[in-house]
């Protein structure tokens, strides 16, 4: 009895302690929510002001507001850690405390946190204000509008190449040193928060613990992404082969029938969405176009009309109207007052019921669908606004992105477009129009999945340290070729930072959300279509006007982050994992059609071919065999010297052979395919236009003209510095120079030796002359040797010298 009594008493004490801790935690969080609302709003408002008016003054105000918010959050995070999660039974309180106990950037020292903030601001500014000088017009073109127009509409291979390279040279090279520092600091922050690296920190958004069967790990996300990509890949390969065949008609001399696709030909600056390739790839051109851009222009649509129609869609499924503040404060078009702004479309939940969208809307079907996507974010924000501050977010980042995409799937259907008067009432759907529609959808949806998967995989590997910074670009394009089937149109060395030329990378966004959202959106779409009682093919489903579907979706949206995402997913679709079957079901008719179209085509891609292969010259260098122990190290400095030497040869050739002054520089000599045993390929572009590749024959002529000079620069000859395909000059092998002091010493010693020899021979000659003169009158002629007299006139010279 006594033991039981003490056990019962202990349980009562523990329960009382837990109850006290929970009450204290509840009071703490209520106070936090109230204070966080104000400070977070001021920080978000300052950020909005900067993004819609990029000035030094606004960046200063933004930094000050962020500093206040960070200091507050750091202190609150420290206080939250005093509450033991084991003593909290209320799951809502526990989730809030767990979120707040993550210190974020406040885990860094004040100095490093400030530096990271400075880096992020600089990267944002460089991206948002980057411009490229057009050599034809001498006009500086920004990304929007300007370069994006070229990448969306131009069919000029070289014009597209100029825009593609210009953006990466002007923006990417500036971002490179900042991004290197960014990786180090973000990794340090992540490890201070008990994550392996920053990629692991990002994957933490999907982690669910303490939820039993609904638990989900960060490692599981990686496995699910790999699994689903393997299932999607056959569809992508068929789409890739079809697009390649079509692009060969537009760019016949620039596409390999078995190779990768040049990155600058894929519809936008990054090759992320292939939507703009539709006009080049439409299967049945004689059918009415399902791209309603022209109809929108003819009917005088503007940005406000686009967003009003998007609002009507949401209202038709019983979701709320936008607030008046939304219409008053949003930036739906690019300002005409000269302000510099961040044009990339984004939805903003500033707090306190202040919801806004920032977008430089153009009257196109693509922006019509983007408006639905961004307004989907706002609907999600409004739905969970009643949740505590720390739970006002999507169930995971992919959910937030998927909501708007669900609406885009319906808004793109011919059924919905006819209802808006954007397709003729007599528009007839048949097999050909359906294939046209599905191909257009696939260019946007399927075409982007490998891009997204590969980009995030590269970043995860960078953060994990699996790709050293000395190989960032090499590995980036290696993975791009292997995974995406896309090749760089010009080789990029380690001065570039091509990934950071995308908004989401420069602005520090996790990117895997755009992969997971695509899987989720089709799972959601299939489930909501069933709720809407749709019958027939999934790709024909339009849930507009279905209040039942809207209410089912709204129930999930209101949860925010208060429940595990695995549970929220199960509530909608019936399972708690990512499943690609709905996506594959949606595109099944297209997949079948593509396989038939590609019957006689190569499906897949070789990674060996590049657009510049035909104009490249291979070089092999043998330092050891030529110089032995005196061989020097081949490094970046030597490569720079090589490029400069080729530039010199090009200048000389154009001057002497063509009577032209062309100022080639080392940056006009492009090097690729570098191997450790010192071999590489190179080609040359015009200094006036990077898209103008100098014909290989011209470069070969220039090399022949200056071959001896190039050999001398590297202390090599034609055998140890080989330009494959260029005949040897048959010039004499290189002879190393002699040191000057050795020459002087040799001359002096030679003079001394010659002087000594001259003196010796002069002495001998004089003696002989003297002896010859004496024999003409012999003073000893009277001496009679027979009588034993000594002839003193005849003595051996050696005897005379010895006696001396």
From Swiss-Prot:
A motif (PTB) lies at residues 791-794. GO terms for cellular component: apical plasma membrane; cell surface; cilium; cytoplasm; extracellular space; plasma membrane. Residues 696-715 are annotated as: Essential for cleavage by TMPRSS11D and TMPRSS2. A motif (LIR) lies at residues 777-785. This is Angiotensin-converting enzyme 2. Essential counter-regulatory carboxypeptidase of the renin-angiotensin hormone system that is a critical regulator of blood volume, systemic vascular resistance, and thus cardiovascular homeostasis. Converts angiotensin I to angiotensin 1-9, a nine-amino acid peptide with anti-hypertrophic effects in cardiomyocytes, and angiotensin II to angiotensin 1-7, which then acts as a beneficial vasodilator and anti-proliferation agent, counterbalancing the actions of the vasoconstrictor angiotensin II. The modification Phosphoserine is found at residue 782. Binds 1 zinc ion per subunit. Zn(2+) binds at residues 373, 377, 401. Its EC number is 3.4.17.23, 3.4.17.-. It is a single-pass type I membrane protein. Belongs to the peptidase M2 family. It catalyses: angiotensin II + H2O = angiotensin-(1-7) + L-phenylalanine; angiotensin I + H2O = angiotensin-(1-9) + L-leucine; bradykinin(1-8) + H2O = bradykinin(1-7) + L-phenylalanine; neurotensin + H2O = neurotensin-(1-12) + L-leucine. Pfam families: Collectrin (PF16959), Peptidase_M2 (PF01401). Residues 771-804 are annotated as: Disordered. Keywords: Carboxypeptidase, Cell membrane, Cell projection, Chloride, Cytoplasm, Disulfide bond, Glycoprotein, Hydrolase, Isopeptide bond, Membrane, Metal-binding, Metalloprotease, Phosphoprotein, Protease, Secreted, Signal, Transmembrane, Transmembrane helix, Ubl conjugation, Zinc. Gene3D superfamilies: 1.10.1370.30. Disulfide bonds join 343-360, 529-541. The cytoplasmic tail contains several linear motifs such as LIR, PDZ-binding, PTB and endocytic sorting signal motifs that would allow interaction with proteins that mediate endocytic trafficking and autophagy. It is found in: Cell membrane; Cytoplasm; Cell projection, Cilium; Apical cell membrane. Residues 18-739 are extracellular. Residues 651-658 are annotated as: Essential for cleavage by ADAM17. Proteolytic cleavage by ADAM17 generates a secreted form. Also cleaved by serine proteases: TMPRSS2, TMPRSS11D and HPN/TMPRSS1. Phosphorylated. Phosphorylation at Tyr-780 probably inhibits interaction with AP2M1 and enables interactions with proteins containing SH2 domains.
């Amino acid at each position: 009895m006594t033991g039981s009594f003490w056990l019962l008493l202990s349980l009562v004490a523990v329960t009382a302690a837990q109850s006290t801790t929970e009450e204290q935690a509840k009071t703490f969080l209520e106070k936090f929510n109230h204070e966080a609302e104000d400070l977070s709003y001021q920080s978000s408002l300052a950020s909005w002001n900067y993004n819609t008016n990029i000035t030094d003054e606004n960046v200063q105000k933004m930094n000050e507001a962020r500093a206040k918010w960070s200091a507050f959050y750091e202190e609150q995070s420290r206080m939250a850690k005093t509450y033991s999660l084991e003593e909290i039974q209320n799951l809502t309180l526990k989730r809030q405390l767990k979120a707040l106990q993550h210190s974020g950037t406040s885990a860094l020292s004040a100095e490093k946190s400030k530096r990271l903030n400075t880096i992020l601001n600089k990267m944002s500014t460089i991206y948002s204000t980057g411009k490229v000088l057009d050599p034809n017009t001498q006009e500086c073109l920004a990304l929007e509008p300007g370069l994006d127009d070229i990448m969306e509409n131009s069919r000029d291979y070289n014009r597209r190449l100029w825009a593609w390279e210009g953006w990466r040279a002007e923006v990417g090279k500036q971002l490179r040193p900042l991004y290197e520092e960014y990786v180090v600091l973000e990794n340090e922050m992540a490890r201070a928060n008990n994550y392996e690296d920053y990629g692991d920190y990002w994957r933490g958004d999907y982690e669910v613990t303490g939820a039993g069967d609904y638990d989900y790990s960060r490692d599981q996300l990686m496995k699910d992404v790999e699994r689903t990509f393997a299932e999607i890949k056959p569809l992508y390969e068929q789409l890739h082969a079809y697009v390649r065949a079509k692009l060969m008609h537009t760019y016949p001399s620039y596409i390999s029938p078995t190779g990768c696709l040049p990155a600058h030909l894929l519809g936008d600056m990054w090759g992320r969405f292939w939507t703009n390739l539709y006009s080049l790839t439409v299967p049945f051109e004689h059918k009415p176009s399902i791209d309603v851009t022209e109809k929108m222009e003819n009917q005088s649509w503007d940005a406000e009309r686009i967003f009003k129609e998007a609002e009507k869609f949401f209202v038709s499924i019983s979701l709320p109207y936008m607030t008046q503040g939304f219409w008053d404060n949003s930036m739906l078009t690019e300002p005409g007052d000269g302000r510099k702004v961040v044009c990339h479309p984004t939805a903003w939940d500033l707090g306190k019921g202040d919801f806004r969208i920032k977008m430089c809307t153009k009257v196109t079907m693509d922006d019509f669908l983007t408006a639905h996507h961004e307004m989907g974010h706002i609907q999600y924000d409004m739905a969970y606004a009643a949740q505590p501050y720390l739970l006002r977010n999507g169930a995971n980042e992919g959910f937030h992105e998927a909501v708007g995409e669900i609406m885009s799937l319906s808004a793109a259907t011919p059924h919905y477009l006819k209802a808006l008067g954007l397709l003729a009432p007599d528009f007839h759907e048949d097999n050909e129009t359906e294939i046209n529609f599905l191909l257009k959808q696939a260019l946007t949806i399927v075409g982007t999945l490998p891009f997204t998967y590969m980009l995030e995989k590269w970043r995860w590997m960078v953060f994990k340290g699996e790709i050293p910074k000395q190989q960032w670009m090499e590995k980036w394009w290696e993975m791009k070729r292997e995974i995406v089937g896309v090749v760089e149109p010009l080789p990029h060395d380690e001065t570039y930072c091509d990934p950071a030329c995308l908004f989401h990378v420069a602005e520090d966004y996790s990117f895997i959300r755009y992969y997971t959202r695509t899987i989720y959106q089709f799972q959601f779409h299939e489930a909501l279509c069933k709720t809407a009682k749709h019958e027939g093919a999934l790709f024909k489903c339009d849930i507009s006007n279905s209040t039942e579907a809207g209410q089912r979706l709204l129930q999930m949206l209101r949860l925010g982050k208060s429940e595990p995402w695995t549970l929220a997913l199960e509530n909608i679709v019936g399972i708690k994992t990512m499943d690609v079957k709905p996506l594959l079901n949606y595109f099944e008719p297209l997949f079948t059609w593509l396989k038939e179209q590609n019957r006689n085509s190569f499906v897949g891609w070789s990674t060996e071919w590049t657009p510049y292969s035909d104009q490249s010259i291979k070089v092999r260098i043998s330092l050891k065999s030529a110089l032995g122990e005196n061989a020097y190290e081949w490094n970046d400095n030597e490569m720079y010297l090589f490029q400069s030497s080729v530039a010199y040869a090009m200048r000389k050739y154009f001057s002497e052979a063509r009577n032209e002054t062309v100022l080639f520089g080392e940056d006009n000599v492009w090097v690729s395919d570098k191997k450790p045993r010192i071999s590489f390929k190179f080609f040359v572009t015009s200094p006036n236009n990077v898209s103008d590749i100098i014909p290989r024959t011209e470069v070969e002529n220039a090399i022949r003209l200056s071959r001896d000079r190039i050999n001398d620069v590297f202390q090599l000859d034609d055998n140890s510095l080989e330009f494959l395909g260029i005949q040897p000059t048959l010039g004499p092998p290189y002879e190393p120079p002699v040191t000057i002091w050795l020459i002087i010493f040799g001359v002096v010693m030679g003079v001394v030796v010659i002087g000594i020899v001259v003196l010796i021979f002069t002495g001998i000659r004089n003696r002989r002359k003297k002896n010859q003169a004496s024999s003409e009158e012999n003073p000893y002629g009277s001496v009679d040797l027979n009588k034993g007299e000594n002839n003193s006139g005849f003595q051996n010279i050696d005897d005379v010298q010895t006696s001396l």
